[in-house]
Amino acid sequence: MIVIIDYGMGNLRSVQKGFEKVGYSARVTDDPAVVAQADKLVLPGVGAFRDCMDQLTAGGFVEPILRHVESGRPFLGICLGLQLLFTESEEFGHHQGLNIIPGRVVRFPGDMQEQGEVLKVPHMGWNQIDIQRPAPIFQGLDSGESVYFVHSYYVVPEDASVVAATADYGRTFCAAVWRDNVMATQFHPEKSQQVGLRILKNFGDM
């Protein structure tokens, strides 16, 4: 059973529909007991880091998430769901994350330029990824694939070996992570057309 955590912040229906398009049913739930029973767990997210952590804590989701990861069952984080895996974020202050992957979440500088043009923050739209490691979710995909991003912050892992893909926007940043059973993307697979559907199918196939 694929379970998508509904903690009040995330584009849940589009993620669910993405799985359905590739032949997998996915259950959206706000019940921590259901989350605890998931075979595969998906943590989406949009909004502010602190608000999402507050919602996860208030909803009783933190412990089931940690237990799921520790059990070795597949886990997929999407966008803010990637950032929440990390130790801390500097978004609107200093806030603690789930600390599943050591590292921090930092903001794109406002003065980034490319070929003399000022780059806008948030980073929004299509961008190519460079696959660094053969994460299971990237099976059948190659570097140079375009995916859809919407974010002002990016993750900086303490251990660079967890970086599964990078992208460039004024600087090279981490676009996806992979460590054992934990995979997460800064971009939105559910908005990334055929490439994104392949990622969701690969996760469902695990």
UniProtKB/Swiss-Prot annotation:
GO terms for biological process: L-histidine biosynthetic process. GO terms for cellular component: cytoplasm. It catalyses: 5-[(5-phospho-1-deoxy-D-ribulos-1-ylimino)methylamino]-1-(5-phospho-beta-D-ribosyl)imidazole-4-carboxamide + L-glutamine = D-erythro-1-(imidazol-4-yl)glycerol 3-phosphate + 5-amino-1-(5-phospho-beta-D-ribosyl)imidazole-4-carboxamide + L-glutamate + H(+); L-glutamine + H2O = L-glutamate + NH4(+). Disulfide bonds: none annotated. PROSITE patterns: GATASE_TYPE_1. It holds the Pfam family GATase. InterPro entries: Class_I_gatase-like, GATASE, Imidazole-glycPsynth_HisH. The keyword Lyase applies. Residues 1-206 form the Glutamine amidotransferase type-1 domain. It is found in: Cytoplasm. The active site is at C79, H188, E190. Its EC number is 4.3.2.10, 3.5.1.2. GO terms for molecular function: glutaminase activity; imidazoleglycerol-phosphate synthase activity; lyase activity. Heterodimer of HisH and HisF. This is Imidazole glycerol phosphate synthase subunit HisH.
